[in-house]
A protein has these predicted regions:
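Phosphate-handling catalytic cores of nucleic-acid transaction enzymes
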Residues: 2, 9-478
Length: 478
């Protein structure tokens, strides 16, 4: 992949839908009918889809208290909520025979010194408090049984968060937790560990747990020096770390589908706008805090029982609401054709998981609104659909901003050159003609030739240009 980190950006970044004419390496495609011009000022607002409720007000309270954007607050909250709901309930498909766990993978990034740990610990607080109460009571009963010389075979109230663990290390804990794992951290190390980014360059990255834990799939491992696990695995991931954690996930997915399972939230930093002083302090409303603590405490007590996922009761979705999900899938599928707006591997992978993400978000929203087990009210399906639609759009712009799709100023210069029929379209001809004019003149002289090579190679990899191997002449695929 071309390194575009320090390349200047142009204004019209990469919204063009590419058509491949006959005679090239790719088949001709129909332009994506709804591909809109790129708007780099797209602002994600997930909260607008959620109707007024105590949970929404609490999320906004925590966002205001920590002065971290509300999208991040919402998704960190849902990540922690899912860490306990995952061990309590599932959500069933329309045939009622298959199900999805309530688990979510949430990856958020924020600036240094913005209170990321504060936000995470705020949402985890009732989990920790309940866990301590359960463990204290367990130890008291155990001590009483020993004093009375009675047998004591109660299962330990098993619930905890891992903050930095390798897949191999996590594998050892699965038998004890009946296949559940729960990861949460405000540090980059978690993302490095689960993606293998912290491994040596020649090390093998094991993403099996990461991939299978999302859907509650079967996992079997045999370790030469460690205990293995065989059975279904279900996991949750909540990470709010410094800027760069999203890049870590994107760079280390390796086409496995790992990144497509995540909610990637990269809210802008408001560090320069933060207000300090007692008059600017804000704390959650007592009623909002109390409702959140009560629901999470009850869920944590139930989650600590560690029932196998096959034994968990389920929420379900009404037929009319399934029709809404199917309608969204039919709407989005037209963007998946070659050259379509969401036709790149990452966006395609996210799009085809629309139903799964909607199911997972909706059941967690319903549970946090005190909805009893059974039918999920339509308002939470509508909210999850709206959230997913906007999230997908935000990832589209995020990938453009990070140079993974679309074009930058250097690439635009090459495209313009290849579009000039009076020029000989070789790499050396381009270097002679353009290396001393902007944007190329802004680059240091040393290594400029390599940047030109990388830019041509990157455009070829994106399917925007191709090279005649016999003549060395480049041609636009458009």
């Amino acid at each position: 992949m071309t390194n575009t980190k320090n390349q200047p950006k142009s204004n019209g970044l990469g919204a063009t839908v590419i058509e491949y004419p006959d005679g090239t390496k790719r088949q001709q495609t129909t332009p994506d009918p709804k591909a809109a011009p790129v708007k780099l000022d797209f602002k994600l607002d997930l909260l607008k889809h959620i109707p007024d409720c105590t949970f929404k007000r609490y999320v906004l309270d925590v966002a205001k208290m920590t002065q971290i954007p509300a999208n991040t607050s919402l998704m960190v909250a849902l990540g922690i909520v899912s860490s306990v709901t995952t061990r309590c309930y599932v959500v069933t498909y329309d045939d009622s025979t298959q199900y999805q766990p309530a688990s979510l993978y949430v990856i958020c990034e924020q600036d240094i010194g913005t209170g990321k740990s504060w936000m995470l610990s705020t949402y985890q607080s009732p989990v920790f408090a309940t866990e301590k109460t359960l463990v204290d009571a367990y130890l008291a009963r155990q001590k009483a049984a020993e004093a009375a010389k009675q047998e004591f075979d109660e299962p330990y109230p098993n619930f905890s968060y891992d903050t930095d663990v390798t897949p191999e290390g996590l594998d050892e804990t699965l038998a004890r937790t009946r296949g559940y794992f729960c990861l949460a951290s405000a540090e980059q190390g978690l993302a490095n560990s689960i993606t293998g980014a912290g491994y040596k360059s020649d090390g093998k990255t094991n993403k099996d747990l990461w991939l299978k834990g999302f859907n509650g799939e079967y996992h079997s491992s045999k370790r030469s020096k460690r205990g293995g696990y065989r059975g279904k695995v279900v996991g949750t991931v909540t990470s709010i770390a410094q800027y760069g954690v999203v890049d870590t996930i994107l760079d280390n997915s390796d086409g496995t589908g790992a990144v497509e399972r995540c909610w990637l939230i990269s809210d802008p930093s408001n560090l320069s706008e933060r207000m300090y002083g007692r008059e600017h302090r804000h704390f959650p409303g007592e009623g909002h805090q109390g409702a959140y603590n009560r629901i999470i405490s009850d869920l944590t007590a139930k989650a600590a029982e560690c029932q196998s996922i096959e034994q968990l009761p389920g929420y379900r979705i009404a037929a009319a609401d399934w029709d809404k999900i199917y309608a969204l899938q039919n709407e989005l599928k037209q963007h998946l054709r070659d050259g379509g707006k969401y036709s790149t591997a990452i966006l395609k992978g996210i799009t085809v998981k629309a139903d799964i993400q909607i199911m997972k978000v909706a059941v967690n929203l319903a549970i946090m609104d005190d909805c009893p087990q059974g039918l999920i009210p339509s308002q939470w399906i509508d909210a999850a659909i709206g959230m997913f639609r906007d999230y997908l759009e935000s990832v589209y712009y995020l990938l453009i901003d990070k140079g993974l799709i679309g074009t930058n100023a250097l690439e635009d210069s090459v495209i313009a050159f290849l579009g000039d029929k009076t020029k000989t379209h070789t790499r050396s001809a381009f270097q002679q003609a353009k290396s001393k004019v902007k944007p190329w003149s802004e680059l240091p002289k040393g290594g400029k030739g390599q940047v030109i090579t990388d830019t041509f190679d990157g455009l070829e990899a994106k399917g925007i240009i191709w090279k005649n191997q016999d003549t060395g002449v480049y041609q636009l695929i458009a």
